[in-house]
Amino acid sequence: MGNHQAVKKLWVINNFSFLDSDRVYSDIFVVGGCKWCLLALPEGNNNYIYDYFSLYLCVPDSEYLPSGWRRRAKVSFTMVNQVTGELSQQQEGVYWFDEKNTTQGFGSMFRLLVFQSSYKGFLVNGEVDIVAEVDVVEVIGKLDVSEESESIDSNGFDVLASQVESVNSLFGKYPCFASKLCPKTPRLKKNVVQSLNEILCKSTKELSNGDLAEAYSALRFVTKAGFKLDWLEKKLKETGKSRLQEIEEDLKDLKVKCADMDALLEFLR
C-alpha cells in the first residue's frame, strides 16, 4: 500500500479532424511512482465498438517493468464543451493496472455522430479538450522512475521536480495569477502552470509553432474561466508577429530564388 496520489491534466488534441493515425497518445506523466499516458482512438475501438470515441489510461513501456507491480487507480475523463465552457460528458471508474492489464478506460466515451458535430461544442476548429483525473489509491511494487519525473508541491501546485525553481520564479513574478488560479480552477491548475512555465522560460526564437498553438489554446481556456492574462496575450502576440515576419522574409528569399531560376531557364532556352 502506498501514499494516496492524484493528478489532473488538460489534454488538448489539435488537428483532430486530420489525424493520420487511429491512435493518439498524450505526453507521459508520473503519479503514484508510475509513468502513465492517455490513449485516444478517434474512430473507436474496432474490436467491439465502432461508433464511439474511445479513451484510455495506459502504462507505457510496461514490458520493461519488474514483475509483481500493481496500481489501483480511480480514473475520470471529461470532454470539455468549448462553446459553453462547461465540463460535460464525464466517465469514471476504478481499475487495477498490472502486467496483464496495462490499458484501462472507456470504449464508448463519446458517440462519434455527436462528437464530430462542430455546433455541439466538443470539436471546435479541429481541437478537442479533455480533462483527465488520475487518482492512484493503492501501490504495490516500487518502479524505477526518475526523481525529475516525480511531482513536488510548489505554492499549492504539483509540478515536476526539475521545474520547481523556474515555477517559483514564475509565481514570484506574477503572484496575483498564482493566488487567483488556485481556488477557481483545480482541474486545470497543474497543466496550465506547467504550460505557462514552459512558454515563459523560452525565448521567442525557441518557441515552435506547436508551442504557440498550445499556448493560444491554454490562453483561450483560462480566459473563458475569468482570468485576465494580458501579459501572456502580449507575449504571444509579439511572438506571433515576429514569426510572421520571419515567414514573410523566407517567402521573399524564395521569390528571389524562383526569379533567378526562371531567368536561368530563360537564358538556357
Curated annotation (Swiss-Prot):
Coiled-coil features, chain-numbered ranges: 228-269
Keywords: Coiled coil
InterPro entries, per the entry: MATH-CC_domain_protein, MATH/TRAF_dom, TRAF-like
Annotated Pfam families: MATH_2
Cleaved signal peptide residues: none
Keyword NAD: no
Disulfide bonds: none
MATH domain ranges (all copies): 6-134
PANTHER family: TRAF-LIKE FAMILY PROTEIN-RELATED (PTHR46236:SF21), TRAF-LIKE SUPERFAMILY PROTEIN (PTHR46236)
Listed name of the protein: MATH domain and coiled-coil domain-containing protein At2g01790
Organism the protein comes from: Arabidopsis thaliana (Mouse-ear cress)
Lineage: Eukaryota, Viridiplantae, Streptophyta, Embryophyta, Tracheophyta
